[in-house]
Each structure stands twice: as structure tokens, then as C-alpha cells.
Amino acid sequence: MWRLKIAEGDKNSPYIFTTNNFVGRQIWEFDPNYAASPEELAEVEEARQKFHKNRHKVKPASDLMWRLQFLREKNFKQTIPPVKVKDEEEITYETATKAVKRAASYFSAIQANDGHWPAENAGPMYFLPPFVFCLYITGHLDAVFTAEHKKEILRYLYNHQHEDGGWGIHIEGHSSMFGTVYGYITMRLLGLGPNDGENNACARARKWIRDNGGVTYIPSWGKNWLSILGLFEWAGTHPMPPEFWLLPSYFPLHPAQMWCYCRLVYMPLSYLYGKRFVGPITPLIQQLRNELHTQPYKEINWRKVRHLCAKPDLYYPHTVVQNILWDGMYLATEPLLTRWPLNKYLRQKALKETMKIIHYEDQSSRYITIGSVEKPLCMLACWVEDPDGVAFKKHLARVSDYFWLGEDGMKAQTFGSQTWDTALGLQALLACDLVDEIAPTLAKGHDYLKKAQVRDNPIGDYTSNFRHFSKGAWTFSDQDHGWQVSDCTAESLKCCLNFSMMSPEIVGEKIEPERLYDAVNFILSLQDKTTGGLAVWEKAGASLLLEWLNPVEFLEDLIVEHTYVECTASAIEAFVLFRKLYPHHRKKEIDNFIVKAVQYIEHEQTADGSWYGNWGICFLYGSCFALGGLAAAGKTYHNCEAIRRGVDFLLKAQSDDGGWGESYQSCPNKIYTPLDGKRSTVVHTALAVLGLIHAGQAERDATPIHRGVKFLINSHLENGDFPQQEIMGVFMRNCMLHYAEYRNIFPLWALAEYRRKVPLPN
């Protein structure tokens, strides 16, 4: 039976390392010796069948596999009876208290033993296939993926295959060439024949691909991986010369100017492109060439297919400037760099420099790398350099960190949202005012955050490797990952400050002030001096004109680092609380930070009064954070036009059932779009309720808040959980991400703040 293992790792292995005893690590293992009871097996099968039956209605899984395990291990039984509120009935303080206690008791029960909250953080259909591609090429597919792994990966593909045979870029999206080609190749590499698979999965996918022009219409990223696999020719891709790494770092086209994720994808790809690496052309690869292309492989004019992209995949078309640049490099620059003498000197020097940076990034992240797109590319680059090398073996030891199991099957995560979910969840629990009842939960969560803070900067001379400092920050996931994140740091800092005001006998010893100062230093470093907005990973400042060179047809704003409303708002809240407790530490800088950050948030407000959410869906998410930041800075409905307009947006967006609901289409279209039929979701409703409470709506007319909370209370499930509904996360405008814990965190937080701040009858 599958089991989720927490904070475990082989400490005797020479290939795996940890900075904090694996705190936050979460890996799935199949234990053939685990004696599952008939009841356990029945629960798991019921969850799988329920998802499969409703898979076209609710795309994100409820993430039940580990929840069933944890609740069973803790023998959790919900003892607080459910409450429902009738249409004309008032919500009393007693009713609100019961709802809060039910949600808090369930949420506490699903905390891991190291203090964090596990959860799925997946959704893109292109995360897992490159792991399969890489392991197939290197000959380690069967060693890493057991029969049980393959079974669950196929289950995931079957569950998320659309009725037309294709897969989207993400689980909610329409069928795309990118998702469908990746899904098809994955099924074939895992052992299915061309006409195998549940409900003719392979044949249906292949038909979709060929009906939409064949594999030559796959977007640029897909062309790269297919060239590596031997299903495409490098001559059919855009140039990615490694020589850019040899330029001065201040040069506008040096990768140092790129957003970190973009830079770390380009890094191994430029190495593989520079070597023109192609995996072994096996009989299966030769079969796939015939199956995926609509004309004989040897007759394809590769030069002409470089700019092709299937219409369903095209969100961000290439600019004329970009196409001229690609063509210039393809026709002039690359032929020079690949001929003597430059191929013997300059190209080899560039490849050596690129590999040096790959090793630096691998070592800095304990061979986890920054994310799931980068991981298989860096792992493959290490194998190409030395198939029996230590670096590749260290990569293999961290592959399992990326895989997640749900009732819909096995998928790959971004890496994990351990710290982010924990920081938000702890604030929701703190708002409950139930310290005596949930003290152990709070203490464990506090302990996790203290152990998860990044204590050092990246190894060695990090500035020459184009890295920002990380000491004092928190990551999105765990400490071993090492990549600093501004809003994760701000939300974790808020938690630690709140815990510092509580009894150490209850929540443990408070964090040392010097570590708080380190966190403050990091946040201050990422504010844009011109706009006042806060970046996420590294300083923003590279020319936005570089976005014209975005080669990824289905994503936007990924070439350079930007500033974001949500991150800025989180930092304001953290600094206001920090300033209260440490009024003399960097006072002038913090005061100036808050003033400029408020101006930035006000400037970013849209015409309808909302704020665009860059990391959550979408205008409801962004508005909740923006209103919270403005309110923390002392802005009110009476002295701030932005708050008045934000409230007006939320009130107009409320649905007839009292809740709120927003379509993921808001993100790519950049226009607020309600769900079909103006349906509501518990997460969007909670975000709107929190936003209205931040803005002081209860002081004017609490009716909209009461209606929203009534929707939340009546949506509560028997055991204290909330229903999984629409997907809630996003990145780069057009790719959705499933934050499975949001359905617990935000409704609990909204109920708790409602009980604390909205006057209710006894």
C-alpha cells in the first residue's frame, strides 16, 4: 500500500544531503508489506472511484490519499456536530464558534509530525513526462518507476484525458498539442502499445495529435525535449547557444538578466543544445516517429517547422523582433559557432562554463533544483557529462521528492508548498483564539517554521553565479530546497512574530531577534526602488522589453523578474507587525518601504476596483491580499479611495447564493470572469469575506459578510473538511496550479476572523 513518509531520508547514503534533518521532506513509497485492513482498502478505492466518476466536472483531486492515512493513524473522529444555517436564520456566536472548532479540529488532525501540512501542489500536465523521458534515455526508468508507480502514473493520465482524446497544458485546460504529445509519449514509454490504454487512451490521443497537424506543431519547449528524445531534429528548434553564458553579466541578453526559473531552464537546455545531444534511437523511438508525424520522418523540412505552433497552444505569439532574432541566430550565428575553429574553442568553453553553473545550482539546492521543469533537464545534463558520475547519482536520490499521489493517480509537483501552506494555515489557526484546544498543533507548526528558515546564503561566491542572497528567508517548500521567496518569508515572519508574543510553555521558545532581522533584510532587498512593488525571488529591474523575446508560446511574463501585489501586501503586513515589536530596527527603511508599497498597491488597482492575482485565481485572490495590505498600513474605507473601490468590486461580484466564484479564465484573459451560472466556491468566498473584513465592511453593513459566511458554514462537510471545487492557483498568466490545502486554510481563516471581528448575537 502507498504510504506518505515525512522527514525521512537515508542519512548513510553518500548521494543525499540535508541541512535540517529532512524537516519538510515528503515522499511517497509503496510498502508491499503494509497490512492494510479491508476498511482501509475500501476507503482508498471509494475515493478513486468517486474521482473517476466526476472527473469531467471537478478536475482537481481532493488529495485524499494522505489525508485518509493521517486521519487513520491519529484515529481522528469529528466530535463536534455539524451546524447548518437556514436562509432567514441569523448566525449566532455559538454557531460561528462550532463551525470554527470543527474546521480547526480537522485541520489540526492533518498536520504532519514535523509540523508542516502536506498537500498536492500540481496541475500542469507537462511536469511529470520529462522525468519519464530523462529516465528512459538514461536507462533508469524501471529502477525508479516500479510497476506500482507506472500504474498510478497511467491512472493519472487516464483520469485527466479529455473526451476528445487530448490533454491540456494543465488539468483544467482545453486539449493542447503540448499536453497531448507529452501524455502520449509517456504512455508509450511506460509500456503501452499504440492501441492500448483505458478507453483506447493511446489511439484517441494519437488521433487528436494527427488531426491537429502532427507533432511538428508542438510549442518550442516540446520541440526541445522531442529533439533530445530523437523524435525531432535539433534543426527544427530555435537556437539556444551556451555562448550567452560567456558574455558580461550586465549585457542585456546575458541569462543573469532573466527570471530565475527561465534562467535555470535555459541553463541545461543550452548545454544539451550546444552538444546537440540525442538519446538512443531505440525501436520504440523509431515507432513513435511514425506514429506522431504526419509525413515520413526523413522527408520533413526541419527549417520550416521551427515557428509552427498549434492554435490551441498559442497564448503568447512570438513578436516580429523575436522571429528575426531566431532566424538570424539560426542562419548566421549558429553555423559559425558550430564550425572550426569556433566549435573547438568558443563552443567548448561555453559548454564547460554552462556545466559549471549547472553543478553550482545542483549543489546549492541539494540536487533538488528549483523546480520540476528544471530537475530532469539538469539531471540529464549531468548524465550526458558523466553517465556514471556522482552528480547524476545525487540527482537520482532526489527524484522521489517530486512525485505526489492522489486519488486521481501519481503526478509531479512544482516541488512542494510545505512552508507556504504552513505559514498561512498557522495564521488561520491563530485567528481562531483556541490556543488551549490546539496548543500542540501551534507548537509543532512554530517548530517547523524555525527549522525551515534558510540560515545561510547560497554556497561559495553566489553573486558570480547570478544568485541573490537567501540568509533569513523562507522558501516555498523546505529548507533543503534553498530558494528564497519574498511572500513566503513575509507570511512566515508574521507567524514567528505572533508566536513571540505567546507563552513559550505553549508554543515553544521564540525565534532569536537576529533571525528576524535577517528576514527583514531579505524582504527589504527585493523592493523595486522605482515602483515600490516587491519581487518574489530576486530583484526586479531588467528591461521589460526582454519579454518580447519570450519563446514560450503558452506562458507570459517569464523572461524577467516582475513585482507583484500579493507579495507586496504580505510584506506590508509583516513589517507593520515587526515595527510594532521592534520599533527601532531599520526604522527609516521600513517606514519608507511601507509608504512606497502602499503607493504601488494603489497604482496597480484595475479600473473595476479589483487587483489582478498573479499567483491565485485571480481578481478575488489579488483583492483579498491588497485590501489586507492597505488595511495593515492604516488605510480605511473612509480615508482611502482604493479600499472603497475594492469593496465595491467585491460587493458587485457576490453571487445570489451569498458566495463568490471566479473562473480560471480570468487569469489569461485579464478580465474578471465569474464561474458558469455564477456558482460559488468555498475558497473564493473565504477570500472575499476576508477582504471585506479587512476593509471594515462589518462596520457599515455586515449583511454581505453574513451571507458569505452562511455559504461557508453550509458547505462544511461532515468530518470538518470542505469540498474540493475549482482549481485555485496560477503562474505566468496561463498555467493553473492546484493548491489542495486552500480549501481548508482560507475558509477556516475567514470563519475565524468573522467570529473575532464581526458582532454576532449570542
From Swiss-Prot:
Record bears the keyword Ion transport: no
Annotated Pfam families: SQHop_cyclase_C, SQHop_cyclase_N
Any one biological process term the GO annotation gives: triterpenoid biosynthetic process
InterPro entries: SQ_cyclase_C, SQ_cyclase_N, Squalene_cyclase, Terpene_synthase_CS, Terpenoid_cyclase/PrenylTrfase
GO cellular component: a single term: lipid droplet
GO MF annotation terms: beta-amyrin synthase activity
The keyword Coiled coil appears for this protein: no
Pathway(s) annotated for this protein in UniProt: Secondary metabolite biosynthesis; terpenoid biosynthesis
Catalyses which reaction(s): (S)-2,3-epoxysqualene = tirucalla-7,24-dien-3beta-ol
Known tissue expression: Mainly expressed in roots, bark, wood, stems and petioles and, to a lower extent, in older leaves.
Active-site residues, Swiss-Prot/TrEMBL: D487 (proton donor)
EC number: 5.4.99.56
Key words, A-Z: Isomerase, Repeat
Spans of repeat PFTB: 100-142, 150-191, 442-486, 516-562, 594-634, 643-684, 705-746
Highest taxon of the lineage: Eukaryota
Family: Belongs to the terpene cyclase/mutase family.
Annotated function: Oxidosqualene cyclase involved in the biosynthesis of quassinoids triterpene natural products such as ailanthone, chaparrinone, glaucarubinone and amarolide, allelopathic degraded triterpene lactones inhibiting the growth of other plants, and possessing antimalarial, antifeedant, insecticidal, anti-inflammatory and anticancer activities. Converts 2,3-oxidosqualene (2,3-epoxysqualene) into tirucalladienol, generating rings and asymmetric centers in a single transformation.
Record protein name field: Tirucalla-7,24-dien-3beta-ol synthase OSC2
Source species: Ailanthus altissima
